[in-house]
């Protein structure tokens, strides 16, 4: 038996354990406190769009901006700083890192407390990066999958589906409702990619998507429109991709476009990279680019789901603009949620910048309303599903 098969067998056994322990009397209905006081989701005579409109109409500007942010927090419990960000800055979404995660039991308690502390009428998205290989959380407490490169080299897309299902079940059991995976980049050398052939990468991304959907957890395709060609780590510095638009469509974009065409786009998000793609926009990184986010992804490819930026604290963008401006630029480019992963001060600057721009008209109110409606609708559709299934 190969190492990959042995690891996969362990994953399937673990998934079975999670399935037997996660029935209606355990995580469903407790992780996400949707109830009469929190939402109007039980207004049976209203359509989903009417419910969404009712919730959004009742939101303040501050609450709307909070829904358009996903922030990192410090500590393994709900600290005073975290409580302040949830209640004063109305943060609507959280991303967790190893600094927040010590054990499955502790994470479940943390996510439950975060949802209880959440003052919004809809639950928090609580996300992690659990790709496999080197990019995993709680490596010593969870059965981490191998790298996507290793999975891709197996030649069997069903393997990707099984790993995604197992990871999804583990995360859901801890109250995490979104995983920023699979990586849809095309690269023959990057261990985070399923491979260097775009059609092969799509088959594995497609299979992984079905795995996450079977586990009833949101997932995120990244890093649009593809960072497989870059030799520079965008955590550290900016990078420019000079590949032509037509070549990007014939290769790098295939895993994204085909997955969008074959899956319900309300069940996943697309995370946009910080690279510059001169074929689409020679001036702005993708995360701040109207031609890429709105013209290409939203209008050209007709993507209806949520668009999230990569972390705004990465070196690829921090040297170019202030944090107050970065959030404004991302929202005006068409992003629905701005990701800021580490420093409370930076998170506050991004929030303050977006709120000020909304109030003085630099961000059109319709731009914010459209995003918040999409966020609320997807939360009602899929986080509420965890209770009702």
PLM regions and their residue ranges:
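Bacterial N-terminal signal peptides that target proteins for export
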Residues: 1-8
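Preference for extracellular/luminal or secreted protein segments
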Residues: 5, 21-89, 300, 319-389
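Bacterial N-terminal signal peptides
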Residues: 10-18
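Second-shell residues forming the walls of enzyme active-site clefts
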Residues: 60, 102-116, 134-136, 196, ...
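Hydrophobic faces of well-ordered beta-strands that scaffold small-molecule active sites
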Residues: 65-73, 92-96, 124-130, 178-181, ...
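Active-site mouth loops of central-metabolism enzymes
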Residues: 68-78, 148-162, 238-251, 313-321
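Glycine-rich, aromatic-flanked loop segments that form ligand/cofactor-binding clefts
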Residues: 115-143, 163-183, 209-225
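A substrate-binding/cap region within the structured catalytic cores of diverse enzymes
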Residues: 148-209, 213
């Amino acid at each position: 038996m190969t190492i990959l098969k042995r690891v996969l067998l362990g994953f399937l056994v673990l998934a079975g354990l999670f399935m037997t322990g996660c029935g209606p009397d355990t995580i469903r209905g407790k992780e996400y406190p949707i109830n009469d006081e929190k939402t109007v989701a039980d207004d049976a005579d209203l359509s989903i769009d009417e419910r969404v409109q009712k919730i959004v109409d009742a939101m303040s500007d501050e609450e709307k901006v909070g829904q358009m942010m996903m922030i990192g927090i410090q500590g393994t419990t709900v600290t005073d700083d975290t409580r302040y960000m949830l209640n004063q800055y109305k943060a609507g979404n959280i991303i967790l890192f190893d600094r927040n995660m010590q054990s499955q039991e502790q994470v479940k308690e943390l996510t439950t407390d975060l949802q209880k502390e959440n003052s919004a009428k809809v639950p928090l998205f609580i996300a992690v990066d659990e790709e496999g290989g080197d990019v995993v959380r709680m490596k010593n407490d969870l059965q981490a999958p191998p790298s996507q490169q290793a999975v891709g080299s197996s030649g069997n897309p069903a393997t990707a589906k099984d790993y995604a299902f197992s990871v999804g079940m583990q995360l859901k059991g801890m109250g995490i409702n979104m995983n920023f995976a699979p990586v849809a980049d095309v690269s023959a050398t990057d261990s985070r990619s399923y491979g260097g052939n775009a059609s092969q990468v799509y088959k594995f991304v497609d299979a992984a998507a079905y795995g996450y959907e079977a586990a009833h957890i949101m997932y995120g395709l990244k890093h649009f429109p593809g960072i497989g060609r870059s030799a520079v780590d965008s955590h550290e510095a900016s990078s420019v991709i000079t590949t032509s638009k037509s070549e990007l469509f014939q290769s790098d974009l295939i895993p994204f476009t085909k997955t969008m065409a074959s899956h319900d786009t309300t069940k996943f998000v697309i995370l946009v990279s910080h690279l510059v793609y001169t074929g689409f926009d020679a001036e702005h990184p993708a995360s701040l680019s109207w031609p890429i986010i709105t013209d290409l992804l939203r209008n050209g490819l007709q993507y209806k789901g949520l668009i999230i930026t990569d972390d705004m604290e990465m070196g690829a963008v921090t040297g170019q603009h202030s944090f107050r401006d970065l959030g404004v630029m991302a929202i005006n480019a068409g992003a629905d949620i701005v990701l800021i992963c580490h420093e409370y001060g930076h998170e506050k600057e991004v929030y303050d910048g977006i709120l000020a721009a909304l109030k003085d008209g630099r961000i059109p109110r319709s731009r914010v309303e459209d995003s918040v409606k999409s966020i609320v609708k997807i939360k009602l559709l899929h986080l509420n599903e965890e209770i009702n299934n």
